[in-house]
């Protein structure tokens, strides 16, 4: 008995020692370039940002030229009402000027909306962008998730959701197309949902950050429903589609005039600076850049999904945004393992372990240029 006991103790101690010596998974956000480059001893300038979801075409050359010729605008305050910018937004979205609010990025508008609605109970379609939960926690309400189902390819079952909704829900938050699943809700289904929410007194926030990347953008956007429903607000920005995350320009659309006035009352004056207002106006009018983006994303997204569909080590899901969610099917291989395989090739994808309801089997990557996309395909082929 004593020999057996000692053997067990020695075996246990070996396991403990092995666990201590194992490389600890680093603590960083999947898109934290500085920390990731430092941890893996990489030159950050050489890392391809497959986790950032930003348009690979970069900032429009025409917008760069226009900005260079109008730098004197820095010496002037922006128009407090952002009249010219709102006219550009109205033309771009085919909406009325009176329905528009301009902000310092979509993040400011998300924060402003949540703080002013101050929901006691909020429902999020998950898994989704973590900033919604962070803002909701700041106002102290109860937060719940309605999780999209993997077996349904993360598509929303609109009937099941509407059956779930109750009148004690104050706010419903939807990202469409959704991050990180890249799934989307049609305008027709969104109309059904808004109708039910209106009857229950539920306000809906729809984040359309990625809608312009969708192959059927106009049949997915809720913008056309703005005049018909006053119980929701669409929020968009230019960080992703127009490759301008440093500009911090976003806008919201709602026909709820009372709520719109509340937002304006609590928003800081000149929330968007002169450069942001001017550049935003030029971006929305740059039809050549918009067309080139649609063409590039559509062709490369189709190619990447076709290639990955032929591998038995991964599963991909229908993608409506400029990014693709991938499930790792190979036994014993985690999302972090795949992240590390990619980062050692200077390719930074997103390990989705931190997303609500996603375990360590999922990664996400965005569409980049063909050469870098090929390099990432090689990583997946090597699994």
Locations of regions flagged by a protein language model:
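PLP-dependent aminotransferase class I/II
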Residues: 59-60, 81, 231-317
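Helix C-cap/helix->beta junction micro-motif
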Residues: 139, 199-200, 229, 345
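PLP-dependent aminotransferase-like
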Residues: 116-174
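N-terminal "arm"/small-domain region of PLP-dependent enzymes with the aminotransferase-like
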Residues: 4-76
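Short loop-beta-helix segment that forms the pyridoxal 5′-phosphate
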Residues: 78, 90-112
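Active-site phosphate-binding strand-loop segment of PLP-dependent enzymes
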Residues: 150-214
